[in-house]
């Protein structure tokens, strides 16, 4: 641990926030339907999509219609992706001859990519063909990300509205975000990745002879194109089982830097766009400050813990002051720490190291970031509306303390909004703790678990936290490709995505119908340090109190076991 490591973490976080501002201003223009510099090329394509699909771009939808459109689109996406995975053996671009996925694995994988989770219970390079990767998984990396940003746009319009029922048009938002934002950025980033050494090919796997004279199969895929949207859309599912620790997905420190920035930049950009459209830029800066504080603290804790000696190495009298187990030497501890904080705070789930090999507090911090709600800065779109839900609860608490009806950005926050907000917030602990409790006692779940005790419980907790939080990363350490794990994790992903989105859209519909109030001397300020502190407190209380007993039995107990081992 040295000053260069701290400087690296600060630089990457600062660069990400800085790049979020211009992207946020561009995103605001998309949400408003304003003209952009891409219009001469993409406007005809946009009109063609509307005409082919029978979409009226002038029609605004109520919150229930918007939610139904989102659910219908997601259901159709699930059916299509499930069919591709099941029929993979009969589809083209499959030179390896991979068979179709079993029903429970296809179910889990289809839900995973439709819900923007990208949990993978399989070894990608030995299971999924190039066609399934491109037509199935990569395309849904775009669509699931665009759907999340569309919901954020609807929530933003609710705060800008004055006694209105419409939240915009889901199909228009989905189309514009995909065409004008995700696709152009992904093309540029993919070309950069190819230039930096990532493969982009449809060729079959190559057999090579190693220096030891052993035959080795080298998997080849169109990696760069999926890697670009994988990180930009906070998807996280990799072409290779090692994910971004694999040299084909993340060959050098420069690609590592780009991928970290990709993970968080659109999360910050959504908040910037929100502030511009609601005319609340100072309030947006307050939200960004909260997000950046959590990412910085998490990265610092992980960096500190992972530069401690590993007890196994100390016991073997090995000279190792840093826990480099499961980490890539080409990145080092600082880049691994900021990556881990970014990927768990952003619902991305892509990894450049193996979290199961982290020290207990390092892995516990990664898990805690997910359990806080994936709002720091969160997934594309979902981070913004998740933070708005907690901001509403924060101003409600402030209103109770001073005896006034709470307001947030000119909208009264009343019982209806608070009930919907609490319904959304409770989805996470109910699914995580409920499924984890069942998995900890049922033989059908435990039979695939390789570790027992505190670490085994941590692996179970992390799996359901990752699935419900739509993150997708894993501690691993157990066989996830079984009917129990594939089914229950799939259900957890559904609850975490759609069980949260529907109450959020209901809140948006309720707020849009209310009058826009003017700020008075009695209005609680939501752009200063007092609100920032209150919001941090609400986030910690909701995350800490709900999950602390479970964390105490998992990573915290394991930490003290490590201290005991080091003291011997």
Swiss-Prot record:
Lineage: superkingdom: Bacteria
Signal peptide range: none
Short name of any one Pfam family annotated for the protein: KdpA
Disulfide pairings: none
Topology term for the membrane: Multi-pass membrane protein
Localization of this protein: Cell inner membrane
A cellular component annotation (GO) from this entry: plasma membrane
Recorded GO MF terms: P-type potassium transmembrane transporter activity; potassium ion binding
UniProt keyword Ion transport present: yes
Keyword Ion transport carried by entry: yes
Chain ranges passing through the membrane: 7-27, 65-85, 135-155, 177-197, 254-274, 286-306, 383-403, 422-442, 489-509, 530-550
Keywords: Cell inner membrane, Cell membrane, Ion transport, Membrane, Potassium, Potassium transport, Transmembrane, Transmembrane helix, Transport
InterPro entries listed in its UniProt record: KdpA
Subunit structure, interactors included: The system is composed of three essential subunits: KdpA, KdpB and KdpC.
Function recorded in the entry: Part of the high-affinity ATP-driven potassium transport (or Kdp) system, which catalyzes the hydrolysis of ATP coupled with the electrogenic transport of potassium into the cytoplasm. This subunit binds the periplasmic potassium ions and delivers the ions to the membrane domain of KdpB through an intramembrane tunnel.
UniProt family annotation: Belongs to the KdpA family.
Protein name: Potassium-transporting ATPase potassium-binding subunit
């Amino acid at each position: 641990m040295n000053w260069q490591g701290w400087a690296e973490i600060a630089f990457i976080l600062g660069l990400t926030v800085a790049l979020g501002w211009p992207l946020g201003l561009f995103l605001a223009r998309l949400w408003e339907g304003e003209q952009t510099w891409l219009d001469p090329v993409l406007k005809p394509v946009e009109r063609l999509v509307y005409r082919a699909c029978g979409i009226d771009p002038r029609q605004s939808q109520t919150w229930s219609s918007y939610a139904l459109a989102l659910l219908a689109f997601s259901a159709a996406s699930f059916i299509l992706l499930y069919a591709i995975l099941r029929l993979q053996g009969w589809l083209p671009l499959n030179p390896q001859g991979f068979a179709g996925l079993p029903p429970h694995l296809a179910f889990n994988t289809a839900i995973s990519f439709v819900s923007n989770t990208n949990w993978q219970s399989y070894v990608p390079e030995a299971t999924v063909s190039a066609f399934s990767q491109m037509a199935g998984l990569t395309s849904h990396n775009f669509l699931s990300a665009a759907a999340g940003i569309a919901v954020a746009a609807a929530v933003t319009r609710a705060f800008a509205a004055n006694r209105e029922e419409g939240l915009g048009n889901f199909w228009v938002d989905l189309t514009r975000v995909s065409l004008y934002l995700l696709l152009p950025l992904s093309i540029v980033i993919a070309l950069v990745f190819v230039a930096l050494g990532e493969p982009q090919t449809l060729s079959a796997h190559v057999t090579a002879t190693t220096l030891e004279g052993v035959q080795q199969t080298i998997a080849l895929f169109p990696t760069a194109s999926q890697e670009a949207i994988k990180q930009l859309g906070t998807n996280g599912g990799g072409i290779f089982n090692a994910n971004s620790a694999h040299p084909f997905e993340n060959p050098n420190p420069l690609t590592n830097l780009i991928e970290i920035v990709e993970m968080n930049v659109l999360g910050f950009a959504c908040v910037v766009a929100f502030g511009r459209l609601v005319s609340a830029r100072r309030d947006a800066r307050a939200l960004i400050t909260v997000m950046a504080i959590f990412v910085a603290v998490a990265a610092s804790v992980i960096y500190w813990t992972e530069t401690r000696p590993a007890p196994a190495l100390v016991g073997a009298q090995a000279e190792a002051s840093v826990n480099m187990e499961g980490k890539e030497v080409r990145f080092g501890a600082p880049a691994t720490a900021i990556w881990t904080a970014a990927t768990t705070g952003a619902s991305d789930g892509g990894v450049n190291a193996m979290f199961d090999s982290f020290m207990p507090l390092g892995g516990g911090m990664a898990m805690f970031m997910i359990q806080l709600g994936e709002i720091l800065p969160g997934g594309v779109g979902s981070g913004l509306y998740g933070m708005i839900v907690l901001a509403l609860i924060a101003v409600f608490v402030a209103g109770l303390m001073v005896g006034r009806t709470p307001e947030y950005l000119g909208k009264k926050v009343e019982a209806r909004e608070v009930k919907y907000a609490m319904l959304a917030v409770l989805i996470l602990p109910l699914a995580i703790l409920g499924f984890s409790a069942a998995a900890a006692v049922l033989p059908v779940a435990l039979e695939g678990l390789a570790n027992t005790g505190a670490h085994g419980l941590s692996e179970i907790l992390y799996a359901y936290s990752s699935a419900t939080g739509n993150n997708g990363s894993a501690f691993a350490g157990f066989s996830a490709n079984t009917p129990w794990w594939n089914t229950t994790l799939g259900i957890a992903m559904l609850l975490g995505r759609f069980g949260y989105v529907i109450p959020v859209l209901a809140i948006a519909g309720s707020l849009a119908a209310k009058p826009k109030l003017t700020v008075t001397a009695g209005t609680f300020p939501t752009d200063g340090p007092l609100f920032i502190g209150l919001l941090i407190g609400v986030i910690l209380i909701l995350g800490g109190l709900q999950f602390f007993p479970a964390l105490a039995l998992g990573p915290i107990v394991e930490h003290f076991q490590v201290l005991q081992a080091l003291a011997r």
